[in-house]
């Protein structure tokens, strides 16, 4: 992989029914039904909606042998109606179910965390090396017969690791780490290679975008060390709904797609499954536009670690850089100074116009020609105004420059002026690559000026802005390069307030600045036995004002307690119409009737002093 120049990773080809993937095949789009798998008609109708929206694979939850056998009828019905889209069985806990599903589905997803190992209990287990080897042998004994069935039936498999369902065995040896997630996957991949079974797709997912990206990068590195090139399925679990789900998914998945990683994706939204497909398509199409872009010559900083990045060292200039939270700058070139109190920018960039009505809690950036020395007013320069910048008396200055503009003269000026905040601009097809090049040039030159990324768009739909800007910012945030974001959408189709909200949403999705309640909510599947979408809406209505609180809303226990380990409170399906409530990892109350559960959740939050009116 070239860190600055886009090219797609060359993966093995995998044959999934009539729709192969990997290699030079297109990046495939998929979704998962949320109907009951024993309801053949409902599954078929929902699968058709997914397919007609553009879905290329349809996954169905497969809890038991009955559900696995019913895949035969679902598959037959779809084929009889002219649909050839492959079906994927989603299996947890039971190898026998996987073996039956392999007879009727074109692909079977298994979870290494619960395929052989017992369900996760968060207990610390101690193994000698000999005992650990015996546990691996148990995997071989159950996994190899499954591979043989898949060989006989030309069935592909996905080895799908979830952060929320790592086994106690893996957790005890590796901890709750990316390394543990990678090893959980590699244990199964090594058996596949040994058995010469190569029709394998892999995924490593988490609701935490940073962990998800770090782990996939680490997995690719480990596969390369072991001469493997299995294709990647990408996704952010429990991304949520609405703009939060879109931004979080685009940031995590986009950060990897922009590096050429990924052969199929699923955008997991807590919405109708077919609603996921257009979002995924927009994301893939946007990233692929950079194929064949003009080459970006750049040198990676020796101290940068792609699989374990740390924040770039900068000096603090006012409230920007150093160890401070990244800032949001809002471009207000039309003299519209209205701001939201919840998503209030740290600075407004007003161009050549000095605003008359100013707030004391916001900084104002103006072009140097408009600067008058007033309090909270800061001058901005371009890279052709270095002499003026050098002699300017302001104690905090902003320099707009591109990578190509970062010449020796500019860098010499920056060495003399640590009080300058750099605002990076790019018109390149691969703006991520050019922004990275600029940041690494600063590192290589020992320059520690804070770095803000100016992301310019011209969108008419808010969803398009959210997807593109999150994808462009994802890797910059995860690589530790971002001290701030200036997000601007040219035209008046999207309000400044919505642009600001998107900028704050990106920083929160990248886990570097919190501005609102965070919801870790799954998309639901056939295991979800309550109305997920309406429940999420009710919980949000009651808790949206609790800034910084994390609430998990999960359909079932497969990933629930694990993915919610980072949440303050959890709402988890426990059976038909029944809910369990959690505080952190601890189950506080079980089997609450669904109609009482939201109220009980609010009572639990209040009882622990985390609720504010």
Label the predicted regions.
Residues 322-343, 531-575:
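C-terminal accessory/binding modules appended to enzymatic or scaffolding proteins
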Residues 29, 90, 159, 202, ...:
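Conserved, mostly hydrophobic/aromatic
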Residues 1-31, 147-153, 289-335, 541:
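N-terminal amphipathic alpha-helix/helix-capping segment at the start of soluble metabolic enzymes
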Residues 56-59, 105-121, 258-274, 421, ...:
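Glycine-rich phosphate-binding active-site loops on the catalytic face of alpha/beta enzymes
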Residues 38-49, 93-98, 249-253, 335-341, ...:
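Short, acidic/polar
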Residues 126-143, 148, 170-320, 398, ...:
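Catalytic alpha/beta core domains of metabolic enzymes, predominantly
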Residues 55-187, 318, 327-339, 344-433:
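Active-site beta->alpha loop and helix N-cap motifs at the rims of alpha/beta catalytic domains
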């Amino acid at each position: 992989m070239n860190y600055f120049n886009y090219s797609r990773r060359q993966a093995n080809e995998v044959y999934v029914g009539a729709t192969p993937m990997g290699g030079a095949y297109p990046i495939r789009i998929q979704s998962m039904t949320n109907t009951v798998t024993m309801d053949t008609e409902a599954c078929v109708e929902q699968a058709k909606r997914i397919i007609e929206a553009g879905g290329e694979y349809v996954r169905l939850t497969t809890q038991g042998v009955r559900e696995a056998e019913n895949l035969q009828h679902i598959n037959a019905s779809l084929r009889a109606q002219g649909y050839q889209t492959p079906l994927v069985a989603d299996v947890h806990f039971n190898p026998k179910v996987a073996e039956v599903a392999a007879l009727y589905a074109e692909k079977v997803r298994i979870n290494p965390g619960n395929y052989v190992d017992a369900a996760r209990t968060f207990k610390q287990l101690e193994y000698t090396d000999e005992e650990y080897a015996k546990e691996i042998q148990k995997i071989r004994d159950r996994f190899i017969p499954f591979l043989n069935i898949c060989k006989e039936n030309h069935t592909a498999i996905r080895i799908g690791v979830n952060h929320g369902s790592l086994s106690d065995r893996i957790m005890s040896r590796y901890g709750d780490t990316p390394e543990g997630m990678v090893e959980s996957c590699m244990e199964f991949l090594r058996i596949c290679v040994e058995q010469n079974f190569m029709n394998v797709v892999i995924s490593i997912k988490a609701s935490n975008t940073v962990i998800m990206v770090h782990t996939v990068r680490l997995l690719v590195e480990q596969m390369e060390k072991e001469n493997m090139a299995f294709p990647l399925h990408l996704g952010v679990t429990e991304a949520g709904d609405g703009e939060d789900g879109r931004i979080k998914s685009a940031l995590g998945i986009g950060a990897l797609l922009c590096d050429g990683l990924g052969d199929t994706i699923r955008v997991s939204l807590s919405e109708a499954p077919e609603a996921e497909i257009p979002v995924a398509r927009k994301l893939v199409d946007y990233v692929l536009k950079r194929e064949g872009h003009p080459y970006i010559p750049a040198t990676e900083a020796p101290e940068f670690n792609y699989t374990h990045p740390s924040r770039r060292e900068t000096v603090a200039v006012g409230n920007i850089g150093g160890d401070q939270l990244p800032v949001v700058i809002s471009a207000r070139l039309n003299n519209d100074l209205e701001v939201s109190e919840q998503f209030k920018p740290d600075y407004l960039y007003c161009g050549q116009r000095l605003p008359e009505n100013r707030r004391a809690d916001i900084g104002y950036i103006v072009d140097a020609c408009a600067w008058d020395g007033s309090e909270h007013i800061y001058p901005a320069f371009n890279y052709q105004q270095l002499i003026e910048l050098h002699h300017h008396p302001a104690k905090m200055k902003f320099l707009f420059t591109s990578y190509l503009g970062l010449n020796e003269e500019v860098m010499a000026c920056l060495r003399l002026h640590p009080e300058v905040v750099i605002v990076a601009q790019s018109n390149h097809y691969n703006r991520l690559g050019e922004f990275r090049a600029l940041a690494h040039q600063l590192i290589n030159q020992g320059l520690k000026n804070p770095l803000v990324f100016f992301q310019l768009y011209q969108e008419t739909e808010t969803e398009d802005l959210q997807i593109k800007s999150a994808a462009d910012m994802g890797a910059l945030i995860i690589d530790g390069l971002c001290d701030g974001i200036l997000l601007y959408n040219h035209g008046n189709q999207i309000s400044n307030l919505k642009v600001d909200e998107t900028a704050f949403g990106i920083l929160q999705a990248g886990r570097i600045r919190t501005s609102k309640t965070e919801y870790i909510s799954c998309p639901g599947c056939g295991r979800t036995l309550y109305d997920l979408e309406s429940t999420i809406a009710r919980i949000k209505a009651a808790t949206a004002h609790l800034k910084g609180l994390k609430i998990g809303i999960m359909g079932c226990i497969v990933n629930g307690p694990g993915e919610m380990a980072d949440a303050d409170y959890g709402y988890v399906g426990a059976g038909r119409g029944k809910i369990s409530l959690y505080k952190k990892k601890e189950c506080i109350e079980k089997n609450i009737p669904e109609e009482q559960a939201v109220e009980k959740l609010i009572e639990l939050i209040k009882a622990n002093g985390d609720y504010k009116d």
